[in-house]
A protein has these predicted regions:
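Short beta-strand segments enriched in small/hydrophobic residues
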Residues: 18-21, 55-69, 167, 175-182
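Flexible loop/turn connectors
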Residues: 231-327
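Short acidic capping loops at alpha-helix termini that bridge into adjacent secondary structure
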Residues: 175, 207-209, 259-265
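Alpha-helical recognition/docking segments in bacterial nutrient-uptake
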Residues: 3-6, 58-166, 229-230, 234
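N-terminal helix-turn-helix DNA-binding module of bacterial transcription factors
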Residues: 1-60, 74
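Short acidic/polar active-site loop segments enriched in Thr and Asp
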Residues: 15, 118, 173-175, 236
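Hinge/beta->alpha junction and helix N-cap segments in small-molecule ligand-binding domains
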Residues: 68-77, 95-103, 153-163, 179-226, ...
Length: 327
C-alpha cells in the first residue's frame, strides 16, 4: 500500500500539518523535527506529490533551459552545472535542445509555458521569434541579448579578445586573422571581434575577420577555414571563436604542412573540460562556465521570488588565459 502523509507523521511523532510544513518549507521548523520527518519518509518510502505541492505553493519548481545543442562542449558543460545547482536548490530542469532551429525553439517555448515553469534560462540564438519585451515569465539570457529588460550573463568577452590578440602579437605573429560566429547576431561574443580589431589597429596591423554563418554546421565551418588558408597563405596567427573551431584550424593547417606553433599559432576560446582533455596543448581563453551558471540561476531565482530591485541587466565575469603549446 502506498504510504501517506499520516504514516510519516505517526512515525515522526508529529502532526500531518507539521509534515506538510516541512515538505513545503513553510514557517519555522526545528532541524531536529525536519530530521525526524525525512527519516520517517525514508522508512515508509514516502514521496511527496509534486503536483499537489505546486498547487499549494503556486510554483512547479521547474526551470526551463533552452540551448542550441548539448553536444557542443560549452553548452554541455554549462547544462551540467545548471542542473547540479538547480538540484541543490530543489529545482528540476526541463532541457530543450533547439538545434538552432526557429521552429523547434518556438515549440519549446510553448511547451515550457504549458508546463508552467517558474523561469527560463535562454542560451538562444534566434532573437526575434518571440516578443521578449512582453514576456511575463522570469527569463535570464546567457551570452545573448534578448531584450533590454532581460538580464544577460556572459564572460568578459572583450578582455578575452584583448588577451588573445595581444598574446599572438607578443609571440611575433605578423598576419593575425580572427574567426568569428555570425556577426549579425547581437551577442556579447561579438566583443571578442571588437577587442581583436582594437588591438590590431593600435598595433598598426590590418584586422581580418572570417565569419562562420552557422558555427554548428561542420561543413560550413570547414569551408570557411579552407577559404581563409587559400586566400591568406601568409597567415601566422589565428584567434578562433571557440575551441572546436580552433581544433579544426589545427587539423587543416597540418594537412597543408604547416607546423604548429612554428609556422602558425592558434588560440581558441571556451576552455571547457572536454576540449582541455582532448586537446591539452591548446592555448585558449577559459570561460568561467560554472560561475556563469551560478550567476544566471541566482538572478533567475530572485526574479521568481519577485525580487526585481537592483537586478543587474548585464553581468560580465572574468576569463583566464590558458597558454598551451599551440602558441
Amino acid at each position: 500500500m502506498k504510504a501517506k502523509i499520516s504514516d510519516v507523521a505517526k512515525i515522526a511523532g508529529v502532526s500531518p500539518t507539521t509534515v506538510s510544513r516541512v515538505l513545503n518549507n513553510r514557517g519555522y521548523i526545528s532541524d531536529e523535527t525536519k530530521k525526524n520527518v525525512y527519516k520517517a519518509m525514508k522508512e515508509v518510502n514516502y514521496f511527496p506529490n509534486d503536483i499537489a505541492r505546486s498547487l499549494f505553493n503556486k510554483r512547479t519548481n521547474l526551470i526551463g533551459v533552452i540551448v542550441p545543442q548539448t553536444s557542443n562542449p560549452f553548452f554541455g558543460e554549462l547544462v551540467l552545472h545548471i542542473e547540479s545547482i538547480c538540484a541543490s536548490l530543489n529545482y528540476k530542469v526541463l532541457l530543450c535542445n533547439s538545434l538552432n532551429r526557429i521552429d523547434k525553439e518556438e515549440k519549446y517555448w510553448e511547451m515550457l509555458i504549458r508546463n508552467q515553469v517558474d523561469g527560463v534560462i535562454a542560451v538562444t540564438y534566434n532573437r526575434g521569434i518571440l516578443d521578449y519585451h512582453n514576456q511575463t515569465l522570469p527569463i535570464v539570457a546567457i551570452d545573448h541579448y534578448l531584450s533590454k529588460k532581460i538580464p544577460t550573463v556572459s564572460s568578459d568577452n572583450y578582455s578575452g579578445g584583448i588577451q588573445a590578440t595581444e598574446l599572438l602579437i607578443s609571440k611575433g605573429c605578423k598576419h593575425i586573422i580572427h574567426i568569428n560566429g555570425p556577426i549579425k547576431l547581437e551577442t556579447p561574443a561579438n566583443l571578442r571581434r571588437k577587442a581583436y580589431e582594437y588591438v590590431m589597429n593600435e598595433q598598426g596591423k590590418t584586422p581580418i575577420t572570417y565569419e562562420i554563418s552557422n558555427t554548428f554546421d561542420r561543413k560550413i565551418q570547414q569551408e570557411v577555414i579552407c577559404k581563409l588558408f587559400d586566400e591568406h597563405p601568409e597567415v601566422d596567427g589565428i584567434f578562433a571563436s571557440d575551441d572546436l573551431v580552433a581544433a579544426s584550424v589545427i587539423v587543416e593547417a597540418q594537412k597543408r604542412g604547416k607546423d604548429i606553433p612554428t609556422e602558425l599559432k592558434v588560440i581558441g576560446y571556451d576552455g571547457t573540460e572536454t576540449s582541455q582533455a582532448l586537446l591539452p596543448g591548446l592555448t585558449t581563453i577559459r570561460q568561467p562556465i560554472e560561475s556563469i551558471a551560478k550567476k544566471a540561476i541566482e538572478i533567475l531565482t530572485k526574479e521568481v521570488e519577485g525580487e526585481f530591485n537592483d537586478l543587474p541587466l548585464e553581468t560580465s565575469l572574468p576569463v583566464k588565459l590558458l597558454e598551451g603549446t599551440t602558441t
